Amino acid sequence: MASSIVTSSLKPLAMADSSSSTIFSHPSISSTISSSRIRSSSVSLLTGRINLPLSFSRVSLSLKTKTHLKKSPFVSFVAQTSDWAEEGGEGSVAVEETENSLESQDVSEGDESEGDASEGDVSEGDESEGDVSEGAVSERAEFPEPSEEAKLFVGNLAYDVNSQALAMLFEQAGTVEIAEVIYNRETDQSRGFGFVTMSSVDEAETAVEKFNRYDLNGRLLTVNKAAPRGSRPERAPRVYEPAFRVYVGNLPWDVDNGRLEQLFSEHGKVVEARVVYDRETGRSRGFGFVTMSDVDELNEAISALDGQNLEGRAIRVNVAEERPPRRGY
């Protein structure tokens, strides 16, 4: 009796179409189906599948078979979402391209602005440099450098003559542009020569005529044209005139430069008096040299002092021989 009731109640289910709504005649089945629909509403929306209780396994089989034969809405849903993803991807690419284009516009505008600024800076800098160079040229035109031909060599300077004293001396011949005494770097002492640059060649020639063989502090100056720049400078010649220089021999050991100068100053003006000393012991070698101012005084000193007794020794006085120049190897 029970099996006939179940069979008769399941016939409408087997004949029903899954696409149309199904009317169940048995109240327990309909209530069970409705409760299962409420519990699995999210699943039925995706798959369209109706889950029945396990007690009715045959009905569940028939329903599963029919739902698989139908076209699953889940596939279409996935396809639609794939299309949306592609559309979204295209849209994102378009957005990125738009952003890139905007950024490129910003960069190009920035480059143009920077380029304009740099061009402005360069042009302003060039103009300012141009002004400075023009000013420098104008200053050079107002203050030209003195001519090399107006530069003079001054030799045989006394060691106490400085650059200021040299300039004051040569101002008697004209305008002095530069006056310089050369000093030893190690000892900071004068080397006995210097250079003077006059304002013109004519004034330089006047200075040569006026101060060559000029007596400055007891020494005769040597003044001539200086060697041009770039050429090898000639060594300053020593001014020891044989006619004015005498040799003094057999001197007592305690006679120094001052005593020798005092002895010869009684017969004229003494330019230089020097006793020769031994470099190792520092003792006098018993001879020296005296330079007189002219030939008359020289001859008078020789006549008066040669053979004279000086502190118990007869000194010898005669004209000094000029030493040959040393050759460098």
Curated annotation (Swiss-Prot):
Keyword set, alphabetical order: Chloroplast, mRNA processing, Phosphoprotein, Plastid, Repeat, Ribonucleoprotein, RNA-binding, Transit peptide
Region (6 X 5 AA approximate tandem repeats of S-E-G-D-X): 108-137
Name used for this protein in its record: 31 kDa ribonucleoprotein, chloroplastic
GO MF term list: mRNA binding; poly(U) RNA binding; RNA binding
Boundaries of the annotated transit peptide in chain numbering: 1-77
Cross-referenced Pfam families: RRM_1
Record function comment: Required for specific RNA editing events in chloroplasts and stabilizes specific chloroplast mRNAs. Associates with the 3'-terminus ndhF mRNAs and protects them against 3'-exonucleolytic degradation. Required for normal chloroplast development under cold stress conditions by stabilizing transcripts of numerous mRNAs under these conditions. May modulate telomere replication through RNA binding domains.
RRM domain residues: 152-228, 244-322
Originating species: Arabidopsis thaliana (Mouse-ear cress)
Gene that produces this protein: CP31A
Compositionally biased region (Acidic residues): 96-132
PANTHER family: 31 KDA RIBONUCLEOPROTEIN, CHLOROPLASTIC-RELATED, OS02G0815200 PROTEIN
A Gene Ontology cellular-component term: thylakoid
Knockout-associated phenotype: No visible phenotype under normal growth conditions, but mutant plants exhibit multiple specific editing defects in chloroplast transcripts. Mutant plants have increased sensitivity to cold stress.
